[in-house]
Amino acid sequence: MTSIHVITRDNRAGYTDVLEEYFRLRHDVFVEERGWRDLARPDGREVDAYDDDHATYLIALDGGRVIGGLRLYPTLRPHMISQSFPHLVRDGRILRGPTVLECTRYFIVRERRMGRADCRLLAAFQEFCLEEGITEVTAVVEMWWLPRWHQAGFKVRPLGLPTQVEDQPCIAAAIRISEESLHQVRRMAGLRGPCLLREASPLRKVPHVAA
C-alpha cells in the first residue's frame, strides 16, 4: 500500500535514506529519461538550490521504497518561476503570497505510472495544501499535464502562454486548492480518507513566509 510522507526541516533527519533515494530517482527521471541534461550531476543526484530548509517534500513510499514524490516551496522566497522562468508569466507578474506555494520535481517511477500511485500523490498534494491553508500552487509543466489535471478534478489557470522549454511546449500555471478537487482525486485514487503521514507527534504548520 502506498503511503505519502510529509518531509520538512523538522523531520528530515529521520528520512535521510528516503531523500537520498528520491534525489537519485529525480536524476533518473529528469536527466536520463526526460533528457534535461543541464541537471546532470556526476554523483547521480539531482539536487538544486531549492532543496534547502524551506522545501517541503511529499514522498510516496511502497514497502519502504520511493515510488514518487514532489517538492513544495514558498513563493515569498526566490523560487524557480521567479528566478528561472519569469518570462513564462504574462507581464512578469509572478504569483506570490503566504498562501501560495510552488510545486516542482513531481514524478512517479516508470513501473508505477499505470496504477493509482499518481492519483494518490495528487490527492496527498491537495490534502496537504488544504491542511496548511494554501489557496493556490504554481508550477511550470509540459502541456500534457493540463488534461491530466483536468481529469483529476483540478482547477487550473494559465499564467502565460505556452513556450518551448527543453524542446517541449511548457506553460506556467496555477492550481486552485479545494475540497471539491480533493474529493474527486480521492475517488480516482480509491481512497476513502486521508493519505498523508506526518510524524507521530503532529508537526507544527509549515512556515510559508520568508524568515
What are the roles of these predicted feature ranges?
Residues D53-A55, R65-I67, R96-L101:
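Short connector loops at helix/strand junctions that flank enzyme active sites
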Residues M1-E46, Y57-I59, V66:
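Short amphipathic alpha-helix that is part of the acyltransferase structural core
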Residues M80-C170, A174-I175, E179:
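Acyl-donor binding region in acyl/amide transferases
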Residues L61-G92:
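Short, His- and charge-rich active-site/binding loops that engage polyanionic ligands
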Residues L58, L70, Y106:
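Conserved GNAT-family N-acetyltransferase fold
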Residues V47-L58, M80:
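A short helix-loop-beta-strand connector motif used in the catalytic cores of GNAT acetyltransferases and
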Residues Q168-A211:
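Charge-rich, low-complexity intrinsically disordered segments
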